[in-house]
């Protein structure tokens, strides 16, 4: 049964909230929270973050004239309540589904999403851009950026704040302090904000205010409580933010609608310099299972609303992430120089398991990929064996450091690139599409693409053994294929692939976990009387040139298959073949890559089918290369 939401049913846009009383806003927040819980229970997605900002979301849309006033959410995974209030409630149960709403803010989706997001710490920079454009054109609309305490561990947030005072006189930054990003926030800024909230001045003021107000007649007690809320900023300070040129207001209770509305109304009037409003919230607020286990309810699959039990299917094989963590532990037990680095994603990268075994050799640097990479470079320069486990999409944030601090110096940093390829429901912002290209372009870099769990174990062993240059290995989200993993895998011979199946007419050269689909394609071609060789490249750099030349020499057509963008493995293969004159005799070649678009969210298998990277797509490419009618093969390449 859907929740009963009589007040929310009357709200079709934020304008409908602006005539509501504080009591009605509280009721609306309760109904938005119930609607969010019910919707996410059916779709899965990010739950805890959105529940923590329900009151803040309602208050912001009540006080500010969105979409005229610009409201930018950092990261965006907390924006489900925002979507419910901004005309998308009728589609909220399509979140993260094919053809449905994005799980993040998205410009193409609504005028209420002026700036898309999914990566951390972009909001203040984007907001400053809106401020500068507004100021130049003489408009008077307001600009607000909402950023979490976890994102405040990213340097980009401070780059923007450092630039704010000299850029504009009107910007409101809402610091949503829930003391919980995905993992607990780390570093000096997290400790600083904790001191603000727990400081003696703040606590003394609260206690004094409560004691004094109790002596007042009842009608004055509420007024005294409001005065106490407004005065907090004057007592607690917020010196760091003030030194950056901001007014500092807070900390205030992010679930107190009355306080939120009044503070935001005052903040909206400030137009002589930027203001930071420090709001303290609880992740998962209002849903007991999420309050008790915020880390377990950051991102969820479908779940039972009553019990909170998530409908997780029994895995047929361990995830690639878990295999990585287990294998790294094995090597760390044998080599005390092995250390691990994560950028605020210990559970997502599996390094929570490594950290349980080797806490003193595990470094969580916060949402700071640039720092993570150069920190790893420093470790490597002094003889350690660092493994930087970073999602492919987030490694993009530290690419200059990969080039300048690691590759140019030939430092043996090992990059464990998780979430390679398509990631399904998280869509284009989280797809691992580009790492093969941008890593493979670097002189001296070793780039591996394991085909299964056992090959991943061998790639890790290879990275441990490489001590004179950087290396990287990529692996996807989700379960492996169920192959047996050796007790301790042997390293691979660098730059050597393998023949998995011998054939004659066409060669299929796979890089990464499309090997299974390549073998299926070979079976389908065999059913049509076409013999296919299937090879596993193992390395995108250095390429196995001997294998390439053999495949080119012995087959009429060559098909390369990869889970990456144009300009990656297939491009490297073409370059190598051209350099060796292997294209001169008329070899028919097709390079199968992800399409040259940003694919919207869907089930991964549907996305790979759209890309032509499933068995049927590989068969179509092979038949086309050979000039054979493929009308009997279902589907088409997108």
UniProtKB/Swiss-Prot annotation:
GO BP of this protein: 1-deoxy-D-xylulose 5-phosphate biosynthetic process; glyceraldehyde-3-phosphate metabolic process; terpenoid biosynthetic process; thiamine biosynthetic process
Residues that coordinate or bind Mg(2+): 149, 178
Annotated InterPro entries: Dxylulose-5-P_synthase (IPR005477), THDP-binding (IPR029061), Transketo_C/PFOR_II (IPR009014), Transketolase-like_Pyr-bd (IPR005475), Transketolase_BS (IPR020826), Transketolase_C (IPR033248), Transketolase_CS (IPR049557)
A single GO molecular function term of this UniProt record: thiamine pyrophosphate binding
Tagged with keyword rRNA processing: no
The keyword Phosphoprotein appears for this protein: no
Cofactor(s) needed: Mg(2+); thiamine diphosphate
Top-rank taxon, per record: Bacteria
Keywords linked to the UniProt accession: Isoprene biosynthesis, Magnesium, Metal-binding, Thiamine biosynthesis, Thiamine pyrophosphate, Transferase
Co-factor binding details: Binds 1 Mg(2+) ion per subunit.
Enzyme Commission number: 2.2.1.7
Reactions it catalyzes: D-glyceraldehyde 3-phosphate + pyruvate + H(+) = 1-deoxy-D-xylulose 5-phosphate + CO2
Residues binding thiamine diphosphate, per UniProt: 77, 118-120, 150-151, 178, 287, 369
Self-association state and partner proteins as the record states: Homodimer.
NCBIfam families, per database record: dxs, PRK05444.2-2
Function: Catalyzes the acyloin condensation reaction between C atoms 2 and 3 of pyruvate and glyceraldehyde 3-phosphate to yield 1-deoxy-D-xylulose-5-phosphate (DXP).
Family membership noted in the UniProt record: Belongs to the transketolase family. DXPS subfamily.
Name the UniProt record assigns to this protein: 1-deoxy-D-xylulose-5-phosphate synthase
Gene: dxs
């Amino acid at each position: 049964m859907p929740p009963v939401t009589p007040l929310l049913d009357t709200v079709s846009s934020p304008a409908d909230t602006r005539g509501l009383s504080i009591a009605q806003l509280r009721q609306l927040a309760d109904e938005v929270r119930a609607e969010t819980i019910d919707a996410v229970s059916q779709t899965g997605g990010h739950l805890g973050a959105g529940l923590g900002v329900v009151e803040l979301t309602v208050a912001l849309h009540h006080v500010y004239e969105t979409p005229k006033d610009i409201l930018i959410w950092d990261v965006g995974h907390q924006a489900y309540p925002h979507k419910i209030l901004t005309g998308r409630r009728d589609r909220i149960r399509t979140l993260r589904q094919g053809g449905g709403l994005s799980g993040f803010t998205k410009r193409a989706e609504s005028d209420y999403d002026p700036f898309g997001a999914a990566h951390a710490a972009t909001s203040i920079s984007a907001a400053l851009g809106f401020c500068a454009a507004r100021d130049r054109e003489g408009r008077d609309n307001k600009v607000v950026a909402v950023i979490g305490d976890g994102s405040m561990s990213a340097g980009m947030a401070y780059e923007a704040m450092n630039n704010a005072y000299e850029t504009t006189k009107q910007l409101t930054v809402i610091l949503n302090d829930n003391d919980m990003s995905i993992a607990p926030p780390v570093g000096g800024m997290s400790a600083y904000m904790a001191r603000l909230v727990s400081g003696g001045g703040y606590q003394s003021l609260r206690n004094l205010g409560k004691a004094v107000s109790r002596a007042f007649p009842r009608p004055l007690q509420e007024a005294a409580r409001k005065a106490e809320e407004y005065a907090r900023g004057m007592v607690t300070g917020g010196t760091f933010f003030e030194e950056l040129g901001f007014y500092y207001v807070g900390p205030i209770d992010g679930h107190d609608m009355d306080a939120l509305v009044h503070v935001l109304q005052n903040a909206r009037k400030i137009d002589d310099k930027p203001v930071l409003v420090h709001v303290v919230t609880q992740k998962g607020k209002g849903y007991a299972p999420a309050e008790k286990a915020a880390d377990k309810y950051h991102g969820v699959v479908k779940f039972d609303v009553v019990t909170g039990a998530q409908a997780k299917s029994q895995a047929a094989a361990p995830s690639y992430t878990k295999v990585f963590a287990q294998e790294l532990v094995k090597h760390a037990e044998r080599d005390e120089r092995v250390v691990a680095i994560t950028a605020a994603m210990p559970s997502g990268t599996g390094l929570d398991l490594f950290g349980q075994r080797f806490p003193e050799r595990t470094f969580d640097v916060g949402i700071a990929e640039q720092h993570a990479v150069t920190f790893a470079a420093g470790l490597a320069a002094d003889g350690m064996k660092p493994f930087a486990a970073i999602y492919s999409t987030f490694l993009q944030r530290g690419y200059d450091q990969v080039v300048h601090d690691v590759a140019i110096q030939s430092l043996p940093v090992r990059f464990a690139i998780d979430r390679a390829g398509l990631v399904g429901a998280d869509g284009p912002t989280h797809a691992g599409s580009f790492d093969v290209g941008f890593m493979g372009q670097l002189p001296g870099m070793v780039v591996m693409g394991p085909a299964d769990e056992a090959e991943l174990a061998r790639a890790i062993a290879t990275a441990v053994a490489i001590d004179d240059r950087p290396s990287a290995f990529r692996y996807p989200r989700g379960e492996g294929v169920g192959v047996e993993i050796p007790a301790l895998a042997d390293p691979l011979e660098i730059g050597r692939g393998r023949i998995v199946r011998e054939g004659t007419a066409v060669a299929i050269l796979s890089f990464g976990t499309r090997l299974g689909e390549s073998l299926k394609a070979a079976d389908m071609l065999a059913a049509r009387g076409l013999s296919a060789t299937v090879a596993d490249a193992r390395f995108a750099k250095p390429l196995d040139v001997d294998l390439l030349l053999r495949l080119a020499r012995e087959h009429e057509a060559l098909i390369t298959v990869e889970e990456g963008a144009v300009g990656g493995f297939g491009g490297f293969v073409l370059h190598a073949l051209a350099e060796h004159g292997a294209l001169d005799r008329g070899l028919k070649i097709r390079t199968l890559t992800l399409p040259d678009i940003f694919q919207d969210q869907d089930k991964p298998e549907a996305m790979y089918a759209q890309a032509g990277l499933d068995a049927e797509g590989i068969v179509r490419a092979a038949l086309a290369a050979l000039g054979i009618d493929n009308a009997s093969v279902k589907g088409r390449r997108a």
